Curated annotation (Swiss-Prot):
SUPFAM superfamilies: Family A G protein-coupled receptor-like. Belongs to the G-protein coupled receptor 1 family. Disulfide bonds join 83-164. The chain crosses the membrane at residues 15-35, 44-64, 86-106, 129-149, 179-199, 224-244, 258-278. Odorant receptor. One of its GO terms (molecular function) is G protein-coupled receptor activity. The keyword Cell membrane applies. One of its GO terms (cellular component) is plasma membrane. This is Olfactory receptor 52Z1P. Keywords: Cell membrane, Disulfide bond, G-protein coupled receptor, Membrane, Olfaction, Receptor, Sensory transduction, Transducer, Transmembrane, Transmembrane helix. SMART domains: 7TM_GPCR_Srsx.
Length: 298
């Protein structure tokens, strides 16, 4: 494992990667703590945000420690079982986070298009949606394990990546079933999530532009700004990595594939808490209130 062609730069690459991982862990843990301890934030929008922060923390932690071990200590060995486990958890968390982003889009859709029905999104309903996202992700990703273990491996044991991806490429047999299942999952789960998110925001825009007041329009759309930024950050590098690996061929240098894949598990988890902290007034106000006693004491 590692980043082929950039071995001499591993130490330098580890510096920004370490910074991003520390910020991602600290930011998401703080966001979860803030939402769980502030009763005024116990609303559907923020409960979904706490789920997103949990998924971001887990996604970064599933990959980053091994990436940093490779970059720092040249610890490039990993057992097959550990590699499969890492692959499973990265895919599992990705699919679950995609479902959470869809749930957040639905939350904004109901809040803006049907505000009088927004009370249907109780804390109990939010918990059920969260459980459904986890269960869906589990059943989608479990077959990956069986598909990997069913293959025959003939001694090739080098994964040209900073974490465990594309394990099936090490097999010496036919991997068409694995490829077809991977494409099917990408299209029918994550792809469907994206389509439903687009539909939700199309309906939101339709409702917003029926409002005569520009101030009211801006206020309605401002509640969606953070979510839209997070959606673009989550899906864009993921699909670039997914499509470049399958169709990029030799047009994109291999180390670019690996760097984008590595940044994908660090940059969104790092930036999501910052985006919501800056763009969401309620969270910004609570952060200021939380630290104001410290400022007074100093």
């Amino acid at each position: 494992m590692g980043i082929p062609g950039l071995e001499g730069l591993h130490t330098w690459i580890s510096i920004p990667f370490s910074f991003m991982y520390i910020v991602a862990v600290a930011g998401n843990i703080f966001l979860i703590f803030l939402i769980m301890t502030e009763r005024s934030l116990h609303e559907p929008m923020y409960l979904f945000l706490s789920m997103l922060a949990s998924a971001d923390f887990l996604l970064a932690t599933a990959a980053a420690p091994k990436v940093l071990a490779i970059l720092w200590f040249h610890s490039m060995d990993i057992s097959f079982g550990s590699c499969v486990s890492q692959m499973f958890f990265i895919h599992f968390i990705f699919v679950a986070e995609s479902a959470i982003l869809l749930a957040m889009a639905f939350d904004r859709y109901v809040a803006i298009c049907y505000p009088l029905r927004y009370t249907i999104l109780t804390s109990s309903a939010v918990r059920k949606i969260g459980i459904a996202a986890v269960v869906r992700s589990f059943f989608i990703c479990c077959p990956f394990i069986f598909l990997v273990y069913r293959l025959t491996y003939c001694g090739r044991n080098i994964i040209p990546h900073s974490y465990c991806e594309h394990i099936a490429r090490l097999a010496c047999g036919n991997i068409n079933v694995n490829i077809i299942y991977g494409l099917t999952v990408a299209l029918l789960s994550t792809g469907l999530d994206i389509v439903l998110i687009i539909i939700s925001y199309t309906m939101i825009l339709h409702s917003v532009f029926q409002i005569s007041s520009w101030a009211a329009r801006f206020k309605a759309l401002s509640t969606c700004g953070s979510h839209i930024c997070v959606i673009f950050m989550f899906y864009t590098p993921a699909f670039f990595s997914f499509l470049a690996h399958r169709f990029g061929g030799k047009t994109i240098p291999h180390h670019i594939h690996i760097l984008v894949g590595s940044l994908y598990v660090l940059v969104p988890p790092m930036l999501n808490p910052i985006i919501y902290g800056v763009k969401t007034k309620q969270i910004k106000d609570r952060v200021i209130l939380l630290f104001s006693p410290i400022s007074v004491c100093c």
